[in-house]
Each structure stands twice: as C-alpha cells, then as structure tokens.
Amino acid sequence: MNPTAQRIHELTDLLNRYAYEYYTLDAPSIPDAEYDRLFRELEALERNHPELKLPDSPTQRVGGEPLAGFAEVRHEVPMLSLTNAFSPQDENGVFDHAEMYAFDQRVRDGLDGGNPEYVIEPKFDGLAISLLYRDGVLVQAATRGDGTTGEDVTRNVKTVSNIPLRLHGENVPELIEVRGEVLMLKADFAGLNKRQAENGQKPFANPRNAAAGSLRQLDSRITAQRKLHFFPYSIARQQGGFEAEEHIQELAYFQELGFSLPNGNFGCFKNIGEVLAFYEHMQQKRPELPYEIDGMVVKVNSLAQQRELGFISRAPRWAVAHKFPAEEALTIVEAIDVQIGRTGAVTPVARLQPVFVGGVTVTNATLHNQDEVSRKDVRVGDTVVVRRAGDVIPEVVRVIFERRPMQETAVAVSDGIGHQQDDLFAETPSAKQTESVPLHKPYRLPARCPICRSEIEREEGEAVARCSGGMLCQAQRAQGLIHFASRKAMDIDGLGEKQIEQLVAQDLVRHFADLYRIDIPTLQKMKETADKGSSENENGDAETVSGDLSKYNTQNGKKQPTKWAQNILAGIESGKTPELARFLFALGIRHVGERTAKTLAQAFGTLERVRRAPEPVLACLPDIGTVVARSIAHFFAQAEQQAMIDELLAAGVAPQAQAVSLPAAQYAGPQRWITRLPGFKISENKAQALWELAGQSIEGLQNDKALPADWQAWRSKAQNTALLENLKTFFAQMPSEDEAAQGSDGINKAVAGKTFVLTGTLPTFKRDQAQALIEAAGGKVSGSVSKKTDYVVAGEAAGSKLEKANALGVSVLSEAELLTLLC
C-alpha cells in the first residue's frame, strides 16, 4: 500500500472512531479543532486521489451532487407494522389498561401458559428505515415504503452523524440488516425552523415531517445540514457475529456495533404489571425527552418465543405499539376572539367546548394568525380536531367540514328565457329553490384592537398582525410590564402579575420608569380601588380580583399598609442594579430572548455600546441573524425607546457593565459587516477586496471615487451615508484589542469554558443567581448531565442529575465549593 493510500486508511479509521466517541459515547477524546484539521486533510487527499476514497469515508457525511430520483429497493424481509393498543385516561388521570392485559393474555395463550418477559422501548415518531451492512460496511439504506418495496436513500443516510459507516467491535457479522427510526431531535427541529424563518421559508409542522422531508431530499447536501438522528430497534437478518437469544441482547449488540440507544428509556421486565408501570412513567417523562415519541413498543423478550408466536396478517403476535392517550380530540368552536401580546402581536384564539385531551381539560386553542385561520377555514360552530402535545399550547389542527352547521337560503332561478324568480314581468313564474350554505361567515381579524381601539396592522411579508397602539394599549402595557418585572428579567421581588394588572388598569403605571416612582399612597389607591371592584363583583370573589394585596392593619380608624407594600417597594429598589443581559431582556425587544440578551452583553459590555451598535455589526454576532439584528437596531433607532431607557436611567436604574468575553470587533471584521449592509449584496471575498481597495478604512469606503460603481451608487443614498458614518463612529469608540483582552482577563480561568449543571435547592442562591455568577465568570450552565459536564452543583433534594453525575464520575460541588471556585 502506497503512503497516500495508507494515510487515507489511517485518517478514515481515526475520524470514524472520533465521530463514534462524539455522537454515540458522548465522550470526545480530541478537541473539535483537531477533528476539523484531520477532516480537511482527508478531504484534500480524496480530492487529489478519488480512486483511493473508502466506502466508509466520513467525508460522505457532507453529501454530494443531487440525484434525479430514488431507486426502488425490494425488502428481503418485509418491514411490517405493529398492532396498536390504547390505554385511555379518565379525568382523574387513571389509565384503563384493558387492551394491554388482553395482549398479555393472548401471548400467554400462544405460549401454552408460559410466563414471558417483555422489553418495552420508545415508539419513535420518525421514519422507519433499513440499513444493510456487508463485512461491517454500510452498503444500502432503504425507506419502509409499502413494507415490501422502499426507496434507496443510502447517500442521505450516510450524512446522519450517529449511523456508523463501518461497524465497531469484535463481533462484526458478515451481513446484518438493522431496522430502526430516523428522527430529528427537538432542539435540532427548533433550530431548523428558526433558520427557515430567518430565510423567509415555511417552517415544518413537526419533527416527524422535518425528518421525513430531510431524508427524502434528492440533494444529500441538504440532508447533511438537517442534523438527523437514528435509533435501531430490530435485526431483520444476520449472518455471522453474535447470535442473540433475547431482544434485550440485540439492543446491547447494537451498542457494541456502534449504534446509539435511548439509554434510560427502555427496559426488560418480568410481567405485564411492571411493563405498565414503566409505560406510565414514560408518559409522564415524555415532555422532557429530547425526541418525540407517541407511545411505547412492547415486545416478548425471548427470540425463541417470538418465533413460536409468529405473525398474524401483517403484524407480529409478539409485539404491540402501546400508544399514549390521544393528544387530539374533537370539540366545537363556540367563539373566536383575539389576544394581544406584549409586542402587540394579535393572536386569534378559539374558545372551545371543554374537552379532555393530553391529560388536561382544554377550553382555548390558538389559531396562530389570520393566514392559518383562512387556510384551515375555522369558523364559529365548527367541529374541530384539537391537539395538545406536552406543554405546548393547544391548537386547532383541522376542521371536520362534514359537521359544519349549514342553513338554507333562497337563490334566484332563471325560467329559461332570461327572467329571474323575482321578475314581476315574467310570463311563467319559476319554482323557488334554496341552497345550503354555512351558517357562519369566514373569520376575519378585527380592524381595530379590542382593547385600545388602535388600528391593527400587518407588515408586508409578516404572518402576524399587530396592534399599533404600543404602550398606549393597556394589554401591551400590562404584558410588557409583567415581562419587565419577571424573575428572568429585572426580578422585582414581590411585584406579581395581579398587582401589575391592577396598576395598569387603574392607569397608575404607564411606562417602565413609572414602577420606580411607586409609593405607599399609590399602592393604597390601587388596593382600595381593587377592593371596591371586588365588593361590587357578583361573585364577591375578593381574592380573585385583588390577588395577594389583601392585608391591612387599622389604627385610629385609618387603614395602614402592612408588609406587602413595603416588600414591593423594597423589591423595586433592590432591582435597580441588574446585570446588563437581564436589563436588555427586560426591555422586551422583539426576537431578543435570554440567550440573545446574554450575547449582546458579552459582545459589547455596556448599555451605551449596545444602544449605538449598527445593524451590520449586530448581524455578525453568534446566533444573531439578519432578522434579529434588524429588530434590535430598529428598537434602538426609535426616539421613544431611547427616551424610555433614559427615563429608567434617570429613575436610578443602573445596568451593570461586564467584561467583554465575545468581543464584537473580532466577529465583525470588515469582510463580514460589509456583506451584511442592507441593500448591498456581496460575498465575503469581494467584500475583503473592496475593503482593501478603500485603503482598509471606512473613510475610504465613504469617499474613494475609484471604487466600483455599484458601491458608489449604494453609498450615495442618504440612509447609507448615515449608516457608514455611524459605523465609523461606533468602531472608533469600541475598546482596543488590548482593552478587550484586559476585559477577558476578568474571566475566571478555573471556570471559563467549563460546563456546570445545577440541581436541587441551594442554601443561599436561587438557580438563576447561581447561573448568572457562573456565566459572568465565563462558564456555561446546562440543563442535563453528560460526560461533557465538568461540575454538578448540588443542593438539597438533588435527584437523578446527582445520581447520574456520580455514575459518570463528574465532580460534584456544594454551593460553598462553587463560591470558592468562583473567587
């Protein structure tokens, strides 16, 4: 073997092993940068010597040129379906497992009274595929199709990171056909839909549709970008290798061969009672899983017993798909009205006849926006399918048009010579006819906000309509103030939703800064008015109206506020020095969540720099695309928003500056921000060339008359001239590289880059406070424990996360030890 071929073999083996460690074991042994370096070396060698490329080369995971179509594949062993079993819940949440007990009895009868063990595993909501390996190398992948014939999706499947291109271990068979499910993890689905929205493309309805659509792309490069995942669940045929006697052994064999398993979410049990207990446990755990499942699959564990039981029609007797309670149900739309959010978003909401679905009674369901209402043609009186998945807001999925209420209406009928039914001069009157038409008209959003009567507007290209009233709208004002004071924003202790709603309803608070002008008389007035409204309420439900503002002392016949009022004022005062990220999040800038607010704080360090940041610079930052950057820049460009911030500063609010750990100047190099200038399309290479032609200065971009004509035409527009001047001023006032480095030195090197998980109740800090301390020191906080976790900080009543940390050998810290590390 020549040196080049040998090096290609070495790199292929190395990179496949590293990918297995990363995607399957969750325990990478080399840094990402080293993997990337080796990958690029292999790419270069294969590009120069394509004849030496190996069938299991990891470079195949990036996809290739588009196909004209998919070839058909006939399954040697048919891909059969499973019989379904259901366990409906009553309104108390109690399951009726009659169908599963019947399944267990059928199995026992088929085994002449034998006592079967069962394996129970997730029923993934994805796309079934079959993987064929010969001598350990993946040679073919096919979809289920009709069970007999599927489609060849080999090229696309090779882009799925956790599918081994070559099998691992000592017991690699000569041939094995692995059946399993391709799916998209919830986090990857959310990321995909975010990118779809930013690119102006239609989002996917659910992870299953996204996975199916991604796997069947003719262009495998698109599939490679979609981050699909695979879990195996059965062996269709096998020659050589380890011969399992039980299904649970097959699952262990999959792991040995290099496949991922849904660890912790399957098990082997002695009887049906234990199986059903695990099913109920998984139904509760379902919303927390990283992937979608719609039930559990129960299989007889013994492969010999499986063969003895055999098949009926197109399904095995030894397995059943135990579906979770229906998360869809039928009900009737009683009314449609709208809700106004804090950004003015107008959301149509269906008011429903109460229906029990997904474990709760649902009375309202979102209709999202006018386009969705029109597309589904939802009307008052319609019978509709309502879906609720996990903690997702219930939504109307579709209308059952056959049940739509109709009415008869008269129609004019011609007599054949041009006269209509109501024509007084007709010689021969026509017979009266009627036609059946819907009782209710199609729904349309109101022209004006039902709260403030401001016009409802919808910008071109936007799906969501918005109330134009801004903070003049009581609904927006209340929601905006609730968000501003919330725990993850300004964290004003003692000031809850009900108090804010009362303050807004009584016009005592109109703007954020008004919160810092509240005094005892204001709170007294609010309480007295709330009490009056309570006493006039037909139900006399004072607690509902006034919330927790209900306690007064009486001295000399005069009402005195008790501790609740002082607590509110103390909470307002103590919240005047928030972290910069919290303050930015509290402002309620459209598209700016906690993560984006943290990015802005880490990139600029001070509020003043964030306020002045130009849109092209913002668009260069990590996880901030053009849509979000435009929204941030638009917010700070509005005089009323700048005035609102100035009012807050004048009221004593002082957002804390922080060390710059993501220096904006490093991310926003000239070749990057030039490509993000609005209305000017250019590649990064050409942007770099333009920058060099301009003498590597913004002044040159502004004034050099030798620059290309398209650039000169762009800069001649007034708004672009102003933008370039803004960019010049902004970069001139940004900290130098030395200053940025000094800021980075403030990061705790013992914590920087480390991943922490918080669990249990800490003795002193709330979790948000502990998270803020860790992030300020340069660390990261994750919600789950893995081999990548550096520290678990455990308080009282720490549960499964602490157990997993101990099992994985992850360092466990107390709050005191965390503080020592941070110092």
Swiss-Prot record:
Keyword list, A-Z: DNA damage, DNA repair, DNA replication, Ligase, Magnesium, Manganese, Metal-binding, NAD, Zinc
One MF term in the entry's GO annotations: metal ion binding
Disordered: annotated segments: 528-558
Cofactor requirement: Mg(2+); Mn(2+)
SMART domains per record: BRCT (SM00292), LIGANc (SM00532)
Binding-site positions, Zn(2+): 449, 452, 467, 473
Catalytic EC class: ligase
PANTHER family (UniProt xref): CHROMOSOME TRANSMISSION FIDELITY FACTOR 18, DNA LIGASE
Function: DNA ligase that catalyzes the formation of phosphodiester linkages between 5'-phosphoryl and 3'-hydroxyl groups in double-stranded DNA using NAD as a coenzyme and as the energy source for the reaction. It is essential for DNA replication and repair of damaged DNA.
HAMAP family reported in the protein's UniProt record: DNA_ligase_A (MF_01588)
Reaction catalysed by this enzyme: NAD(+) + (deoxyribonucleotide)n-3'-hydroxyl + 5'-phospho-(deoxyribonucleotide)m = (deoxyribonucleotide)n+m + AMP + beta-nicotinamide D-nucleotide
Name by which UniProt lists this protein: DNA ligase
Residues forming the catalytic site: 123 (n6-amp-lysine intermediate)
NCBIfam families per the UniProt record, alphabetical: dnlj, PRK07956.1
GO biological process terms held by the UniProt record: DNA repair; DNA replication
BRCT domain location: 746-823
Disulphide bond pairs: none
Coiled-coil annotated residue ranges, if any: none
